[in-house]
Amino acid sequence: MNWDLTSYFPRFDGPEMRRFKEALRRDIASLKDRAASLLPLNDENASGWEDVLTRNEALTRRMSHLSSYVSCLAASDGRNEDYLKEEAALASMRAELAKVRVELLRGVKETPDEIFASFIAQHSLDGAQNYLKRLREEARRAMSTEKEILATDLGLDGIQAWGRLYDKISSRLEFDMLYPDGNRERLPMSQRRSLLEHPDRRVRKAAFDGGNAAWQSVEDAAAAALNAIAGTRLTLNRHRGVGHFLDLALFQAAISAKTLNALFEALFAHLEIPRRILRLKAKSMGTNGVAWYNLGAPIDIPNRQPLSWDQAKDLVKNAFTRAYPTLGHFFQIEIDRNWIDWEPRAGKRPGAFCTSSMLSKESRVFMTYNETLGDVLTLAHESGHAFHGYMMREVRPYARIYPMTLAETASTFGELVLTHGLLEDPSISDAQKAMMLDVEVGHGAIYLLDIPVRFEFEKSFYEERKSGELSVSRLKELMIETQRRILGDVLEPGGEDPYFWASKLHFYITGLTFYNFPYTFGFLLSRGLFAMLKKEGKDFLPKYEEFLRLAGSDTAENVVQRTVGSDIGKPEFWSEAIQSLEEPFLRLEELLPKVLPSAQS
């Protein structure tokens, strides 16, 4: 590991960590008993429920600290048995804390509206109203307390265990990488992503083929995990009276069906915009279409040099500081305090994430840096998440529970600050400008084609899963069908990725369902916000910071309306954000012939 975790605990499994866990476990048990002893919320016992809520919030803060620490350790070394054992033990402790939430659901489920309204209006609950209203909404579709507790207990060794199995498989999985020069290397799966963004198409294809051969070797286990996770959710939905499997996803995203429909109405009306981006990519490669493994690939501009970690830090810091000094200052804090685990090594889990502790008010960023421009964007993306946590550091825990739709807005806003900051630097060459424009429009293709493929695949998968488990062959077939439908003729024959359902971690995250459309939502909302920044200048930044602070205080629609005055329930908002990709696309199209001879025809 090359990050500093000592502000969590001086060392793993040391006396400080043991005492922390013992006290947390004891306090959870005490609060669980206290909550279970109370009758449903009424005028006489309001102070008792207020005490439970206050103590539960404090426990949530402490649990976030321990969870963040353990997730850092397990992700950084997925082969360490002690870390994996601690991860499983933590899941058990979280399940016990979840039982307090079950009691809270019981407490507010049948409470008359006037008593509930009076209760949440108390001064001690200022800032927690949105959390409590959502709790009541969830309570109205909850099973009996006994069944909810049973579901929590079973989840530990059921749906969550399947998720942990996938994490274990992916962190230990390796693939054969055959380079164009004939050199062969055995690599951890965590390094595949960067190779799929390599400028050389032959390298990308080798990483794609080698990676999929590895995923094929574990296809049965991956399919079993995917079927079990979805099957559990569908069963619980049925017992809770959830009408449609997307209802829970919408609740978690804090948006209405109207808003999601507006987004996809605009997206499907403008599919030709991201398809044109891919056609330009295909033209630069001298092909008529692109394979799936080319989706996130950069255009192969000559003399592209690897970017060292020090160069990456400087690029992000300078761009952030120039456009948004507060963000640049925060990024320097990340670097100075060594909050980022970036080095490639065996045993690291694939992917990237940001995790925060509500107790220490710090964040950590996990990624694997392989000297590509895409990795620099990942650094900016995850730092956007970390900055969001920094802006909310003084917000009470109940108001820090915000949806992925708004979380992904903060991260992609960070990407835009980086790309536009570099584009506005007068010292960069035409080739460097072309690279940055390629990154900006290339991300448009990912968020407007790749992510919708995930969403449409998962919808179809859940529809079919109602009738029984899907075989490996059907999962592959369904993925290919979906990729063809969304990408259209820009996807070259045979260029599909039949194992995308296995290699994509997000399908196996058990805490959130449909972990895909929030990315498209965040990408487009961030473009809308960034357009406001360009128009209003630094006068917009206080509005943006208020947007970040209020992310857990209301629905996404209301937060956006309240802070920047936009109506995201209308397709027009999303259409305008999608069409904003036209300008960088045309700039790239004009610039390419100057830096890429093959693009002159």
Regions found by a protein language model. Name each.
Residues 304-309, 360-380:
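Short pre-active-site segment immediately N-terminal to the catalytic Zn-binding motif
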Residues 305-307, 340-361:
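Catalytic zinc-binding patch centered on the HExxH motif and its immediate surroundings
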Residues 377, 389-412:
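Post-HEXXH active-site segment of zinc metalloproteases
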